[in-house]
Amino acid sequence: MQLFSILNELILVPILKLKILTMQKHLFLGVEAIGQGAIDGGMSGVYSYPGTPSTEITEFIQENQIAEERNIHRKWSANEKTALETALGMSYAGKRAMSCMKHVGLNVAADIFVNAAMTGVNGGLVVTVADDPSMHSSQNEQDSRFYGKFAMIPVLEPSSQQEAYDMARDGFALSELTKVPVMLRITTRLAHSRAGVARKDVLPENELVMPTDPRQFILLPAIARRKYKGLLESQSLFLKLSEESEYNRYEEGTDHSLGIVACGIAYNYLMEHFPGGTCPFSVVKVSQYPLPENYINRLDQECDEILVLEEGAPMVEEMLKGFFSNGTPIKGRLDGTLPRDGELNPDIVAKALGKEMFEGFDIPDVVANRPPALCVGCGHQDAYLAMNEALADYSKGRVFSDIGCYTLGALPPYETISSCVDMGASITMAKGAADAGLIPAVAMIGDSTFAHSGITGLLDAVNEKSSITIVISDNESISMTGGQDSSAYGRIESICIGVGVDPAHIHTIVPLKKNHEEMVRLFREEFAYNGVSVIIPRRECIQRASSRKRNKK
């Protein structure tokens, strides 16, 4: 009897508690739903680099109790390329893995992303990419679905938080079935809005199992040619799975003057105008790609014209223009029915449907524009003030910046920087400008961005003895995305020395008002130096320092 009681406490009670927990509905952000879905899907590791709007997926997993109990890998990677490569390594060993990034991060990971479709997977691999239409915190609003189409892998695009959870949970099984990585593509609004989500059973993790084909992950040309043919032959399976997917469906309407293709969250926007859940027009809901040709053909046969609702670029709209042979008119972003750029929203969809749309009110002139600004007390402020004074004797346009909080140095009162293009471009653009004769040229880069993509540019500059000064503004965290730990923490000087920078021209200083004159002197000396120099203004992010002090109380 005592043995039964012990077994009951150790086995039955935890199982029942977990069952009750998973039956409950949870109010999740889209990013949280994906994190929970990945955990419940038997994931063994998540590999990511912070980037809005994807950051909170990994943060949710880092703080999750089940992830802690299972010891799921959940540390940040140096960049998106290393993240996805490491996730593929876990897949190689038979475990399920997820890699998360924002849309421009996929540019960084493009090499491994495309080639992973060729190698295929062993354990399930889900690549979650968060797009940012309207560029709320990004350089562009590129549509990651094109990458999925280019790599010829299945793409999942949820229309709701519940689908985001389900796709994250079941995406590993789809990856193992198709033997390729699966992309899970979301956008900002779905990532950062809440809805009720019903959890399902928590699946066990995979056992460590080596690939059955010892050459599966060796892309020598002779093997790669065979693998590529196999990927092409798999397209019919991917199409079949898409046509049979629970996420794609045909909703019959009574008014055939218009047919609608609604992709991902655009389906949600469409149905907001039909509270009863019945749209008078026939609708093809698309949340899994490749496009379900059976439903698309039926819509073409039954409807006079087609309206395509999709968040991002007109990818499906362009495909349909070449898909239909009978000249069915297609409306969407390309013909002006919908705006060519920016986010979709329910009001824009209403206008496309011929419904009344509330235009809103003009902002009164008395309301002052309030652009983002560096935090009061931020170390970047002191660095820019000193840099501006040291550069006063030179012409403008010499400071090449990077991606981070310090990009706000483009705005008043500093107006220091002249570029912000992509991660790591500060050093390489400064080198190119110096090669063209713009001397001195200055690169402004953060500590985490330096680790992400700046080291190779520094190596180029050292190899050619370029006349550039690199300012690595070190706030000891990835502050712009929430204060995550930087991969370069405590290592910047060692990295610079290891790459070949002369230690005599590596300087570290605390960016404070009391050190202003010393900073100006350092900048002036190194701007005049004919070679590579590095100045590291180091002070903890003011927001992170405040948070740390609050947590101590």
Predicted regions and their residues:
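Short helix-loop-beta junction
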Residues: 62-67, 271-283, 494-502
